[in-house]
């Protein structure tokens, strides 16, 4: 199937940047002297936890919805998401005046469900361990004439996600390595398009939770591997497989897929809070955790870390901080 896909290019990322700039935040790039000393390197953190609705997903959602025709806008959109894409679609739809229905798992963080509803999205719940959300979405969209905007496997979505890395490179210049959180691959594939444009020799790494290493398996096998829903605190990376669009780009433009443990994620979450004074959700800690694990190989290099988001329940966050 992937052989017939027309894959996005960097030009699509650049176009997305123009399309979303009126509404999307140009998020800050932070540095930490503590991290630079620990790594003996220059490390730059692109903080998408400061994006509208708290995560990079706003970029892709807004880019995709902005390109719908009038009939599609009037009928409305449908998506399925564990949280951040749900909020992103709900907020983007609200901004553009488009009705939105969102299929969310019963165990999605309450903060993400509440925010999605708060932005005006109509939430439909499902059991992620029993139900097939993509099948549900197909049935509802066909019945109601809605346009499905999937969380990651969509050319306009992944092009939008790539705008975060584009901004990072434009602000700090060439990098030797870029670490990107990996769930379904929208952020990683979009970031890889940007990295190859700005710094062709930059090593691009995707990072998954150990329990959900479908991307790593796929990368090594050369074809998409499906797994059961992984049990991990990185709720934004509980995807069961990469997408056709995302994997097609990842296998060509990414250097490797790494994994980290939940314990490493908690260590990074606590570091972000204590030393950098920022709230980062567990999934957003994937990139830094992997860079820390291989810091010996990164000495005297310029490193980019994309923090994917900061949407975490306060009670859950407090629990992680106390561990």
From Swiss-Prot:
Residue list for modification N6-(pyridoxal phosphate)lysine: 57
Amino acids binding Mg(2+) 2: 208, 212, 214
PTM statement from Swiss-Prot or TrEMBL: Modification of the active site Lys by its substrate Ser to lysino-D-alanine reduces but does not abolish enzyme activity.
Annotated residues for binding of ATP: 32-33, 52, 87, 119, 277, 311
Protein name: Serine racemase
Keywords (A to Z) from UniProt: Allosteric enzyme, ATP-binding, Calcium, Isomerase, Lyase, Magnesium, Manganese, Metal-binding, Nucleotide-binding, Pyridoxal phosphate
Catalytic activity: L-serine = D-serine; L-serine = pyruvate + NH4(+); D-serine = pyruvate + NH4(+)
């Amino acid at each position: 199937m992937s052989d017939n896909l027309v894959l996005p290019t960097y030009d699509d990322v650049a176009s997305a940047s123009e399309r979303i700039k009126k509404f999307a935040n140009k998020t800050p790039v932070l540095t930490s002297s503590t991290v630079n000393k620990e790594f003996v390197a220059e490390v730059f953190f692109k903080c998408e936890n400061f994006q509208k609705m708290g995560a990079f997903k706003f970029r892709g959602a807004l880019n995709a919805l902005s390109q719908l025709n009038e009939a599609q806008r009037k009928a409305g959109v449908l998506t399925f998401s564990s949280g951040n894409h749900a909020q992103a679609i709900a907020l983007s739809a609200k901004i553009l005046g488009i009705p939105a229905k969102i299929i969310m798992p019963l165990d999605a963080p309450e903060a993400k469900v509440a925010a999605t509803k708060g932005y005006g999205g109509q939430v439909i719940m499902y059991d992620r361990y029993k139900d097939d959300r993509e099948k549900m979405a197909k049935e509802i969209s066909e019945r109601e004439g809605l346009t499905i905007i999937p969380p990651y496997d969509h050319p306009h979505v992944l092009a939008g996600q790539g705008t975060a890395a584009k901004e990072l490179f434009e602000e700090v210049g060439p990098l030797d390595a870029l670490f990107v959180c990996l769930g379904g691959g929208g952020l990683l594939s979009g970031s890889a398009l940007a990295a190859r444009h700005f710094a062709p020799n930059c090593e691009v790494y995707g990072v998954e939770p150990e329990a959900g290493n479908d991307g790593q398996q796929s990368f090594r096998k050369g074809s998409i591997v499906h797994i059961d829903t992984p049990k991990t605190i990185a709720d934004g990376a509980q995807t069961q497989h990469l997408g056709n669009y995302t994997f097609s780009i990842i296998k060509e433009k990414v250097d490797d897929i790494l994994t980290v443990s939940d314990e490493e994620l908690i260590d990074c979450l606590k570091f972000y809070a204590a030393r950098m004074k920022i709230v980062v959700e567990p999934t957003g800690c994937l990139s830094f955790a992997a860079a820390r694990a291989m810091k010996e190989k990164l000495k005297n290099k310029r490193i980019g870390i994309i923090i994917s988001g900061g949407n975490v329940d306060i009670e859950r966050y407090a629990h992680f901080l106390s561990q």
